[in-house]
């Protein structure tokens, strides 16, 4: 038994070792499927949401308001654009350890694949980027059944914190006060609400602290490398033949869902489409081949095509992010390229991306047998999440998350305050009441996931 306990503690320390794009045009396939509000289904990929779910009393401020707003403000005030998350990570380590008394560790991304059991250092953060792992209980770091997680990186540019009150005193702040700044929604609102929710449940003795673990990852807005690192290390430890180790029963992911419980989100694939032509004088286009011309023709067909759809996730949509080509207006271009981001609504998580790729490859051959090269950059199909929880309205998201980056047989829940429609914009923000509603929502989800 002693050997097993030591291994569990070793596993506890060993763990340390792609957004919604609404394309505005008049084509059927570039819009979500319209869902009849009169239907029995409560899932809608189209609606613009309003706050819902278990909510805090909006007349009387909850006892945790001051701590919630203070934590949220501190997180926003620290710039953490993807790949530069170290300072906000240091803040969280200090906050979780010194303010809450949790066990908190840094999980460095570098070197994780070669030696997952020796990649931590609690004090020296010069090793580079790191995830933040925290356990409310120090009794057994390997016993948690529910993972509560979100991301601490944000998109550029940095936007300072602001709250719409004449004073920041507790008396002046109401549930209608508006908080803005980069990350105020995506996803520092979720981070703050999750931490407060966990602490409130523990203080009320509604959960066993040993059942919970917190994970705040880097890199979600770019490649998902933070969650992918955690997944690799976690699953390497789980696959160890030395002893059976406990597995998470559920993972609760924090992302802006307007405090609705997401039933899943579209998948994603994409890459760079390159066209090769024959350069020549622009006065004689029939003698040469314009790379930009055939590229535009192919892109038009891709946008107009039915790349797959489903009742839950709507239509697969395409965003042409960048187009480049040619050297001068009077030269027929030899080369042209475009970067595509495709939100996949067909198939399942394992097959959806392949369905879309096959459809795109077929279109390219129809336009020109030899001119195109498509460099695909990974991908996955629609991601399902559990949304069968009493007290929540539901939705389906068109953006990507870290849900597919954490491999395992756990149940996934996707929920959080704020709207994705402002998440990456200059007007990113949400109301105090939305934050407080999220705290209550996370409390409900945690208790549901634990079967409490």
Curated annotation (Swiss-Prot):
Primary residence: secreted
GO cellular component, one term: extracellular region
List of catalytic residues: 220
PROSITE patterns named in the record: ARGE_DAPE_CPG2_1 (PS00758), ARGE_DAPE_CPG2_2 (PS00759)
A Pfam family matched in the record: M20_dimer
GO biological process terms held by the UniProt record: proteolysis
InterPro entries: ArgE/DapE_CS (IPR001261), Bact_exopeptidase_dim_dom (IPR036264), Peptidase_M20 (IPR002933), Peptidase_M20_dimer (IPR011650), Peptidase_M20A (IPR050072), Peptidase_M20C (IPR001160)
Keywords: Glycoprotein, Hydrolase, Metal-binding, Protease, Secreted, Signal, Zinc
Annotated disulfide bonds: none
Glycosylation: residue positions: 140, 315
MF (Gene Ontology): metal ion binding; peptidase activity
Binding site for Zn(2+) 1: 186, 221
Binding locations of Zn(2+) 2: 186
Signal sequence bounds: 1-28
Location relative to the cell: Secreted
Origin superkingdom: Eukaryota
Cofactor(s) of this protein: Zn(2+)
Free-text cofactor note: Binds 2 Zn(2+) ions per subunit.
Family: Belongs to the peptidase M20A family.
Name of the protein in question: Peptidase M20 domain-containing protein SMAC_03666.2
Organism: Sordaria macrospora (strain ATCC MYA-333 / DSM 997 / K(L3346) / K-hell)
């Amino acid at each position: 038994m002693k050997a097993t306990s030591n291994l569990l503690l070793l596993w506890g320390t060993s763990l340390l070792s792609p957004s919604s794009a609404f394309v505005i045009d008049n084509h059927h396939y570039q819009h979500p499927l319209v869902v009849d509000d009169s239907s029995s289904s409560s899932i809608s990929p189209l609606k613009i949401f309003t706050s819902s779910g278990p909510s805090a009393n909006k007349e009387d401020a909850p006892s945790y308001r001051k701590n919630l707003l203070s934590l949220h403000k501190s997180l926003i005030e620290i710039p953490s654009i993807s790949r530069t998350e170290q300072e906000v990570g240091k803040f969280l380590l200090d906050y979780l350890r010194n303010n809450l008394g949790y066990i908190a560790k840094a999980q460095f991304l570098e070197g994780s694949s070669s030696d997952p059991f020796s990649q931590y250092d609690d004090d020296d953060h010069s090793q580079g980027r790191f995830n933040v792992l925290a356990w409310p209980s120090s009794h057994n770091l390997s016993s948690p059944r529910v993972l509560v997680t979100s991301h601490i990186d944000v998109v550029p540019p940095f936007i300072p914190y602001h709250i719409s009150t004449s004073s920041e005193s507790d008396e002046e702040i109401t549930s209608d006060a508006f908080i803005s700044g980069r990350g105020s929604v995506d996803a520092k609102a979720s981070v703050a609400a999750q931490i407060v929710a966990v602490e409130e449940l523990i203080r009320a003795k509604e959960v066993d602290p040993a059942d919970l673990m917190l994970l705040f990852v880097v890199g979600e807005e770019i490649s998902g490398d933070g969650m992918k690192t955690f997944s690799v290390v976690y699953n390497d430890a789980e696959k160890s033949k030395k002893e059976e180790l406990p597995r998470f029963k559920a993972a609760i992911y924090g992302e802006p869902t307007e405090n609705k419980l997401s039933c899943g989100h579209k998948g994603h694939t994409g890459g760079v489409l390159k066209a090769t032509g024959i350069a020549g004088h622009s006065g004689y286009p029939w003698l040469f081949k314009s790379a930009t011309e055939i590229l535009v023709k192919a892109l038009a067909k891709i946008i107009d095509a039915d790349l797959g759809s489903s009742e839950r996730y709507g239509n697969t949509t395409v965003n042409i992010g960048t187009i480049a080509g040619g050297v001068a207006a009077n030269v027929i271009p030899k080369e042209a390229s475009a970067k595509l981001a495709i939100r996949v609504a067909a198939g399942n998580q394992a097959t959806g991306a392949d369905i879309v790729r096959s459809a795109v490859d077929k279109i390219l051959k129809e336009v020109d047998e030899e001119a195109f090269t498509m460099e695909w950059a990974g991908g996955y199909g629609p991601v399902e999440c559990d949304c069968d929880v009493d007290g929540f309205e539901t939705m389906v998201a068109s953006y990507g998350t870290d849900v597919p980056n954490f491999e395992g047989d756990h149940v996934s829940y996707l929920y959080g305050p704020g709207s994705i429609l402002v998440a990456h914009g200059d007007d990113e923000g949400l109301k105090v009441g939305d934050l407080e509603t999220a705290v209550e929502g996370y409390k409900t989800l945690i208790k549901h996931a634990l079967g409490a």
